[in-house]
């Protein structure tokens, strides 16, 4: 079983932020929110904070504080795992994580009903301009699998272009010539394909449709990419809430195809779902694992935007996995009290620390990797800016 560990990584190119549905491809050189990209030197990492490149003013708050978090179902299991250890370190600070999808995480952070909004998608230009002080804080690196329910079929190979045609309703059978051409020698059934997609506003949808936009021009000029898009009308498509819902729906539906965040990989395997090998930019077929995710991030560039918004989609490289992303906690730079601001800083610093939330044990359980060390100083500076 594949386990992610923090490895040497290099920061990807800064690229465009997008709204709930964007026509700009994820490889655009414009940074989200119009920020100027800054160059960071490549550096190895053991997964998280370098411990002291910024004065984050950490410590146990003087009174009990609860940090409410809502959002990404991909990030949620990781936050659940590290919350008790965080409370052990800071007895007056408690993290209260909740799922709901990245769209809910961002909207709750904007509304102030949650101090932290978990999201697989970075903030769009309009979200940032409409909400001054709202920040992207990367806390880990994750990826996304494409799963399927075809008993007796293993090692299935798919491309972003073919997947786009499936979700457009242009490819409807698993033995379609376009799929067969990617799987020479394989016996594919004439089973009807049932595409499953998220019904909630989802960061998983954001990164999945980013790949489709990068590999299929019709998709780019049509649905494009975002946490919510206008999906093509496919008569037999199914919808689901969250990554658990995607796994359950696909398990119950022979012929299904579904995109599932990597933190639900174990659940997908337990459900008997296959995991497709995806064609990368070099033309090779790869599965998501520690080395292919590292290759994707390393194949990006060494520049990052000042607003820390950067996708890692369809990067070059022989072993690069094509759907990789930063996991974000969206936060306001001003909190309601000094103690709450300290608790929020404490948690964010803990989450990225290689002796805190980003230990190999925590990361591996969710198949995550720690932040590249070249990103950490900017992240720590952003954390340090949170005040009351």
Which functions belong to the PLM regions below?
Residues 2-10:
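Sec-dependent signal peptide recognition
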Residues 12-17:
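C-terminal motif of bacterial Sec signal peptides marking the signal peptidase cleavage site
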